[in-house]
Amino acid sequence: MPEVIELEFHSKDVSEFQLRRLVRASVRKYTVPVTAFISDAFIADDTCVGVSFDHSEKDDAYHRADGSILHTGKIQSARKEGRFWLLETQDGNYVIASFRRDLGRASFLKLLQSADRF
């Protein structure tokens, strides 16, 4: 029987494509515990910014609720697990479910290229 996945949207509409990617990312098993899944991701100053889903550190005031904007700590490593990128940062492990349409993938590729120089 399929597992039921509940998403609460508080501040961002999500396209069908993004929703499918979030569901696929969330049912996969990862080698480390995942802090949150990120949609509409882009890279800025060696950090990832995007829309957070299924964050492990929700509180009573709904901080970090599904659909809220997330800004990670500095990215320490990035690796592909299955079809998704896993980011290890100062404050947790994040899975990129989808990139922001206009600059997301390009900013991520720039981060990967800058890491290759070292």
PLM segments and residue spans:
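Feature for intrinsically disordered/low-complexity regulatory segments and propeptides
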Residues: 3-50, 54-60
